[in-house]
UniProtKB/Swiss-Prot annotation:
Segments passing through the bilayer: 92-112, 143-163, 284-304, 337-357, 377-397, 422-442, 481-501, 520-540, 632-652, 678-698, 721-741, 764-784, 815-835, 848-868
Region (Disordered): 186-256
Record keyword Plastid present: no
Species classification: Eukaryota, Metazoa, Chordata, Craniata, Vertebrata
Catalysed reactions, as listed in the record: S-ubiquitinyl-[E2 ubiquitin-conjugating enzyme]-L-cysteine + [acceptor protein]-L-lysine = [E2 ubiquitin-conjugating enzyme]-L-cysteine + N(6)-ubiquitinyl-[acceptor protein]-L-lysine
Binding site for Zn(2+) 1: 9, 12, 36, 39
SMART domains: RINGv (SM00744)
Name of the featured protein: E3 ubiquitin-protein ligase MARCHF6
Mutant phenotype after disruption: Marchf6-deletion mice are born at rates much lower than Mendelian frequencies, with peri-natal deaths commonly occurring. Mice that survive early perinatal mortality exhibit growth retardation and/or postnatal lethality. POMC-Cre-mediated Marchf6-deficient mice exhibit hyperphagia, reduced energy expenditure, and weight gain.
Domain observations: The RING-CH-type zinc finger domain is required for E3 ligase activity.
C-alpha cells in the first residue's frame, strides 16, 4: 500500500508539499492517481479538455472567494454589472448589425446596381451610378438579385482557382507547354492514348498522363487514329527546338511565381479565419474585405458577363440573328454563350499568331485563357445542354402517354419558359443519373472488358476536368453526338415504342391521369404524405431493390450467354483455360474489333484498370466462339427485346395494381397517377420482398419456416401497434392541437364555427411530428432525445413494445391529451359556472388555446430570464470577489465528482 511519502504527481513526478498539495481528482489509481493543481491547470490549458483522458471523469473545481465578500451582493454592484452587460450587448448588437448590413445589404445591392448599370448600355446610367447606389427603390428585389450575382461571381472565382490547381497539378496540354500550333496533334495523340481504339498499336495506353481520357460516354472511332498519326508526323517535323527551350524557361519562371504565390497564400491563411474575414471576431477589418469583394464582383461581372455578352450581341446583330434569339425567351444566356464561342475562336487565332512570332509569354497567357473558356463551354454543354436535350426528348416521346401534343408543350413554354426549361433539365438529369447508375451495376456483373466503350465512373483516376483540359474540342463534339444518339435511341426503345404497343393492345389503359386537381374525397395532402413518408422511403432507402435488379441482370446474362454461347465473353471463365494458345487466337482480333485484345495489353487493360467498387480488377480474356459478330448482333437484339418487355411491365403493372387498390379507397373518382403508380410499386415491392424471404427460408426446413413466420408475425404486430400509436394517434392529436391553437383563431371569425378535417389534421401532424423529432435529435440531451435515440438504435427487428409505450408513447400522448382536454374543460365546464354571457363563453372557448399557449411561452421566457439573471449574479460575484479555485478530490463512496461548481478555468489566480 502506498504511503504519503511515496505519492507523486503524475505530471511533474514530484511529491506534495504544504504549499503544493497533491489531489486525486479522478478515478485513476496507482502512479497516476495524484496530481498538483498547478500541473493539472497547465495540462488543461495545453489539451483544451475538461476531463481525464484516461478515465473520462470530469474534473471539478470549487471557487475560493475573498473573506470580505458579503452574503448578498450590494445593489450598486448588481446594477453596475447589469449596466456593463447591457453595454456589451449593445456594442455587439451594433457590430453584428453593421456586419449584416455590409454583407447582406451593401455587397449584394452594389453588385446588382453595377450589373444593371453595365447592361443598361447607356452613358447616363454610368453617370447616375453613385445616385443609383443610394436609391431605395426596389430595395428588397435588388438585394435578392444581388445575392444571386454575388453567388455566381463567387462560384466563378472558386472555379478559376480550382482550374488553376488542375492545370498546375495535372499538367497543361502539350500544345501549351511547347512552342507548337494550338492544334498540336502530337500532344493530342499522347493525351488521347487511353481513349483510342487500336490498343495493340499503342502499348503506352496505360500511362496515367490523361486518366480522364477514359471518361467517354461512348467509345471513340478507331479509324480516326490514322489521321491523328499523320498530323503527328507533320507537327513533329515543324517543331522548333529553340521555341521549346524558351517555352520551358518561361514555364519554369511561371512555376516559380506560382510557388511564391502559394507561400504567400499559406502565410495569409495562418492569420485569416472565417470569423476575422466576415467580421464576427468584433474587429472592423471586414470592411476591407467588403471593399475587395465589391471590387471582385465588379471585375468578374465586367470580364465574364459584360464582355462576352456584348461580343455575342454585336455578332448576332451583324449576322441578322437577333430576332431569332429574342424569340427564344433566353436572349441573354444565348447571346453570352455565342460571345464565349467567338471569344474562344479569337483566342485560338491569337494563340497561333503569338506562336508564329514567338511571343512565348503572350502565347501561354492566351492558351490559358482559351482553356478557361473551353472548360466553361464544355461544362455548360455537359451539365446544361445534354440533360436538357434528354429531358425534351423524353417529353416528346411520352406525349401520347399523357394525352398531350406539341402544341400544349409550346403553350406551356410560352407561358413559363424558365420553369419549363428547368423541369425538362431536371428530368434529363434524373435520366442521365439513373442511366449511369445502371452502367455501374452492369460493371459489377459483366466481365471486365465488355463495357470498355462506356465511361468508367468507378475509376479513382477519373477526372473530367483534366479530360476537358487535354482533349481537343472535336473529340468532345464527337462524343456528345454519339451520346445523344445512344440516349435518344434508348428513349425510343423503352418509352415511345412501349407506349405505341400499349395503345394498340390496351386502348383504354392510356392516358395517365396527371391533372393537378382531383375530385377524389381523399385529401391530396394525405396522399402526398403517404407517398413521401411510407412509399418512397421503402423504395429508395432499401438496398434490396438494387440487389434484386443485380440478380435479374445476372440471370439474364447467364441465360443469354448459354443461349448464344457467349458466357465466356459476358461473364468470363470461372477457371483458367488450359489451352492458352487458343486464348491468343480467340483474343487477338483485328483493329476494328476492340473487344479482342489479349489480357493486360492495349485499350482494355487501360479502360478496365478499376471497374468495381471493391477494388482494381484486371482485364479478363474470353473464349471467342464461331460466328462471333452474328452472336453479338443477336445479343443486342435479345437485349432490346428484353428492355422492351421490361418497359412494358413497368409502365402497366404498377399502375394497374395501384388503380385497382385505390379504387377501394377513392371509388370511381380519378386521382393523380403518381399515387396509383407509387401504390402499385409499393405493393409489388412488398410481394417480391415476401417471395425472396420465403425462398431464402425454404432450404432450412418446415420447422424453421414456421418459427420464422411466427417471429415475423409477432414483429409485424408490434410494429403495427407502434405505428398506430406513433404514426396515427400522436400526429392526429398534434395536428388537432395545432389547428386549435394556430389555424382556427387566425382563419375562422368568432361568429363562425370551425370545421375540422381529421385527414388533413393527421397529415399536418405527421409533418409537425417529424420536425419536432428532428429538432429534438439536434438539441441538447434530455429524456425525449434519449428515448428516441434508443428506439432508433433498436430498429424494427429488435423493437421493444413495452419500452416504447412506457417511455415514449404514453408520456407524449398524455401531454397532448392534457393540452387538448384541460382548456376544453375550463372553457366548457368552469366558465359557464361563473355566469358569463354566451358571447363571452364563445370568446373564451375560441381563444383559450392560444391564450394558454401565450401563458406557457411567457412562463418559459420568465424562467429563462431568471436563469440568465442567476448567471449574471454569479458572473458579477466571481469578477469582484473570486480569488482562486481549489481542485476537488474524487469521492469513491458517492461515485460523484463533488458539489456543483463552475466549469474549470485555464488559469489560477
Amino acid at each position: 500500500m502506498d504511503t504519503a511519502e511515496e505519492d507523486i504527481c503524475r505530471v511533474c513526478r514530484s511529491e506534495g508539499t504544504p504549499e503544493k498539495p497533491l489531489y486525486h481528482p479522478c478515478v485513476c489509481t496507482g502512479s497516476i492517481k495524484f496530481i498538483h493543481q498547478e500541473c493539472l491547470v497547465q495540462w488543461l490549458k495545453h489539451s483544451r479538455k475538461e476531463y481525464c483522458e484516461l478515465c473520462k471523469h470530469r474534473f471539478a473545481f470549487t471557487p475560493i472567494y475573498s473573506p470580505d465578500m458579503p452574503s448578498r451582493l450590494p445593489i450598486q454592484d448588481i446594477f453596475a454589472g447589469l449596466v456593463t452587460s447591457i453595454g456589451t450587448a449593445i456594442r455587439y448588437w451594433f457590430h453584428y448589425t453593421l456586419v449584416a448590413f455590409a454583407w447582406l445589404g451593401v455587397v449584394p445591392l452594389t453588385a446588382c446596381r453595377i450589373y444593371k448599370c453595365l447592361f443598361t448600355g447607356s452613358v447616363s446610367s454610368l453617370l447616375t451610378l453613385p445616385l443609383d447606389m443610394l436609391s431605395t427603390e426596389n430595395l428588397l428585389a435588388d438585394c435578392l438579385q444581388g445575392c444571386f450575382v454575388v453567388t455566381c461571381t463567387l462560384c466563378a472565382f472558386i472555379s478559376l482557382v480550382w482550374l488553376r490547381e488542375q492545370i498546375v497539378h495535372g499538367g497543361a496540354p502539350i500544345w501549351l507547354e511547347h512552342a507548337a500550333p494550338p492544334f498540336n496533334a502530337a500532344g493530342h495523340h499522347q493525351n488521347e492514348a487511353p481513349v483510342g481504339g487500336n490498343g495493340a498499336e499503342n502499348p503506352a495506353a496505360d500511362q496515367p498522363a490523361n486518366p480522364a481520357g477514359e471518361n467517354a460516354v461512348l467509345g471513340e472511332n478507331p479509324d480516326a487514329q490514322d489521321g491523328q498519326a499523320e498530323e503527328e508526323e507533320e507537327d513533329n517535323e515543324e517543331e522548333d527546338d529553340a521555341g521549346v527551350e524558351d517555352a520551358a524557361d518561361a514555364n519554369n519562371g511561371a512555376q516559380d511565381d506560382m510557388n511564391w504565390n502559394a507561400l504567400e497564400w499559406d502565410r495569409a491563411a495562418e492569420e485569416l479565419t472565417w470569423e476575422r474575414m466576415l467580421g464576427l471576431d468584433g474587429s472592423l477589418v471586414f470592411l476591407e474585405h467588403v471593399f475587395w469583394v465589391v471590387s471582385l464582383n465588379t471585375l468578374f461581372i465586367l470580364v465574364f458577363a459584360f464582355c462576352p455578352y456584348h461580343i455575342g450581341h454585336f455578332s448576332l446583330v451583324g449576322l441578322g440573328f437577333e430576332e431569332h434569339v429574342q424569340a427564344s425567351h433566353f436572349e441573354g444566356l444565348i447571346t453570352t454563350i455565342v460571345g464565349y464561342i467567338l471569344l474562344a475562336i479569337t483566342l485560338i487565332i491569337c494563340h497561333a499568331l503569338a506562336t508564329l512570332v514567338k511571343f512565348h509569354r503572350s502565347r501561354r497567357l492566351l492558351g490559358v485563357c482559351y482553356i478557361v473558356v473551353k472548360v466553361s463551354l464544355l461544362v455548360v454543354v455537359e451539365i446544361g445542354v445534354f440533360p436538357l436535350i434528354c429531358g425534351w426528348w423524353l417529353d416528346i416521346c411520352s406525349l401520347e402517354m399523357f394525352d398531350a401534343t406539341l402544341k400544349d408543350r409550346e403553350l406551356s413554354f410560352q407561358s413559363a419558359p424558365g420553369t419549363t426549361m428547368f423541369l425538362h433539365w431536371l428530368v434529363g438529369m434524373v435520366y442521365v443519373f439513373y442511366f449511369a447508375s445502371f452502367i455501374l451495376l452492369l460493371r459489377e456483373v459483366l466481365r471486365p472488358g465488355v463495357l470498355w466503350f462506356l465511361r468508367n465512373l468507378n475509376d479513382p483516376d477519373f477526372n473530367p476536368v483534366q479530360e476537358m483540359i487535354h482533349l481537343p474540342i472535336y473529340r468532345h463534339l464527337r462524343r456528345f453526338i454519339l451520346s445523344v444518339i445512344v440516349f435518344g435511341s434508348i428513349v425510343l426503345l423503352m418509352l415511345w415504342l412501349p407506349i405505341r404497343i400499349i395503345k394498340s393492345l390496351l386502348p383504354n389503359f392510356l392516358p395517365y391521369n396527371v391533372m393537378l386537381y382531383s375530385d377524389a374525397p381523399v385529401s391530396e395532402l394525405s396522399l402526398e404524405l403517404l407517398l413521401l413518408q411510407v412509399v418512397l422511403p421503402a423504395l429508395l432507402e432499401q438496398g434490396h431493390t438494387r440487389q434484386w435488379l443485380k440478380g435479374l441482370v445476372r440471370a439474364w446474362t447467364v441465360t443469354a450467354g448459354y443461349l448464344l454461347d457467349l458466357h465466356s465473353y459476358l461473364l468470363g471463365d470461372q477457371e483458367e483455360n488450359e489451352n492458352s494458345a487458343n486464348q491468343q487466337v480467340n483474343n487477338n482480333q483485328p483493329a476494328r474489333n476492340n473487344n479482342a485484345v489479349p489480357a493486360g495489353e492495349g485499350l482494355h487493360a487501360a479502360h478496365q484498370a478499376i471497374l468495381q467498387q471493391g477494388g482494381p480488377v484486371g482485364f479478363q480474356p474470353y473464349r471467342r466462339p464461331l460466328n462471333f459478330p452474328l452472336r453479338i448482333f443477336l445479343l443486342i437484339v435479345f437485349m432490346c427485346i428484353t428492355l422492351l418487355i421490361a418497359s412494358l411491365i413497368c409502365l402497366t403493372l404498377p399502375v394497374f395494381a395501384g388503380r385497382w387498390l385505390m379504387s377501394f379507397w377513392t371509388g370511381t373518382a380519378k386521382i393523380h397517377e403518381l399515387y396509383t403508380a407509387a401504390c402499385g410499386l409499393y405493393v409489388c415491392w412488398l410481394t417480391i420482398r415476401a417471395v425472396t424471404v420465403l425462398v431464402a427460408w425454404m432450404p432450412q426446413g418446415r420447422r424453421v419456416i414456421f418459427q420464422k413466420v411466427k417471429e415475423w408475425s409477432l414483429m409485424i404486430m408490434k410494429t403495427l401497434i407502434v405505428a398506430v400509436l406513433l404514426a396515427g394517434v400522436v400526429p392526429l392529436l398534434l395536428g388537432l392541437l395545432f389547428e386549435l391553437v394556430i389555424v382556427a383563431p387566425l382563419r375562422v371569425p368568432l361568429d363562425q364555427t370551425p370545421l375540422f378535417y381529421p385527414w388533413q389534421d393527421w397529415a399536418l401532424g405527421v409533418l409537425h411530428a417529424k420536425i419536432i423529432a428532428a429538432i429534438t435529435l439536434m438539441g441538447p440531451q434530455w429524456w425525449l432525445k434519449t428515448v428516441i435515440e434508443q428506439v432508433y438504435a433498436n430498429g424494427i427487428r429488435n423493437i421493444d413494445l413495452h419500452y416504447i409505450i412506457r417511455k415514449l408513447a404514453a408520456p407524449v400522448i398524455s401531454v397532448l391529451l392534457l393540452s387538448l382536454c384541460v382548456p376544453y374543460v375550463i372553457a366548457s365546464g368552469a366558465v359557464p359556472l361563473l355566469g358569463v354571457t354566451a358571447e363571452m363563453q364563445n370568446l373564451v372557448h375560441r381563444r383559450i388555446y392560444p391564450f394558454l399557449l401565450m401563458v406557457v411561452v411567457l412562463m418559459g421566457i420568465l424562467s429563462f430570464q431568471v436563469r440568465q439573471f442567476k448567471r449574471l449574479y454569479e458572473h458579477i460575484k466571481n469578477d469582484k470577489y473570486l480569488v482562486g479555485q481549489r481542485l476537488v478530490n474524487y469521492e469513491r463512496k458517492s461515485g460523484k465528482q463533488g458539489p456543483s461548481t463552475p466549469p474549470p478555468v485555464s488559469s489560477q489566480e
